Amino acid sequence: MKRAVQFFFVCQVFLAFASGAVHSLSIETGTALLQGLDKVTARVSTFEANLNQEVRFGTLEVIVKKCVKTPPEETPESAAFLEIRDIKPGQDLEILFTGWMFASSPSLSAMQHPVYDVWVIGCLD
């Protein structure tokens, strides 16, 4: 019984911190700052992407659906909801990634592509 109470307490503490982190990303912005790596040339490019506008990086097309960041008084964090498509001439459009990317943890939800990597740097006002 004592273990069950301890487990319940630990779960409650975890949920309290987790829910606070989710709600702290409260400032919505209109532009995401992204970086892309071309693995063939080893070149890193930094580019801005406005909400719901297509931005090209190599054969990729990146669309930012939402970009949020924490208020200045909290630990810095930015997250963007992205849709990344691969556009190859003469082939159908392929959606490579749809989901949230976090600036502090780019490997948490990474896009898989043999030539390119894309990650979030931050959200701009």
Report each predicted region and the residues it spans.
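N- and C-terminal low-complexity/disordered segments
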Residues: 2-7, 11, 20-125
